């Protein structure tokens, strides 16, 4: 039976060109370095250590060049524990310990980091101009070999800063780990299969106005893409009441409700877009002057001017770097009833952080496409919000 729906091949729309020397090169000549990230064990980090980890990330981001994208992708996939009984010298107690957890369900966590060098024009593009809708033109800026060399040097310095912190370990992914081999599926193939294991077969991707499917799995997407959706105050960590007492605190990261505390198959994506901070601040200065001129016609314009002025005052007085950011949770299930429960769980976890949960159905295909390893530069600019990165020497 012929498929009457409008269809195309993945090859014709695939945004990546090649993998060379451990870097992913897109058809728009964006260069991406990929890492596997080893994070501290949950429930073992103190409040002071969370502050130190946050400061280390800020220091590392500062060394990246303008028009770079940091994409941190945390995978949480339901699996069942399989004991390793083939180790040599295993005694009775060790074997009993392994068998005690046999087939016990758990949430498998993998963390990846993608650092992308793109161009000014690419960072400004919106969802109606991504690689799902157009062809490819290589920007003149990215053709300069010196640009690529400086970016790789910055990436190495970035990794060194995080590895020297003692809390986070980065391991550069090889070409085979990115593209895969005859025996192992690479992370790009795993993303299209929504699986951390080897993909047995290729899955069809269906995009409709109501939902998006990858094989039998239906996707649901919740986004944090506006400052109005964020809580009034954000911290590096929070108290976990279930394991805390009057005398001791158990600390978790502020975003832990979207990580291991969310018991479903999901990916937590975090994006930081690093542009030219001085240009961004000058653009805000111009916007503030326009709002001042229009304030007599609308009180909302006057309020917006005050917010922009406060943002500029903070940035200039404290030496903050202007960046854009976006966060989303992409969950999936092959069962329609379970997906309804997952939607409620994700929304309630976001609400527990003080955020306004936004179930985004319109941009799910576009954001799924931008989440492809090495394709973060294809992210739609209108889905991000402006914020600041601490730029002081003790950050």
Language model regions located:
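Extended, folded cores of ATP/NTP-driven motor/assembly subunits in large transport
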Residues: 1-390
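Conserved small/polar residues in nucleotide/adenosyl-binding loops
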Residues: 391-395
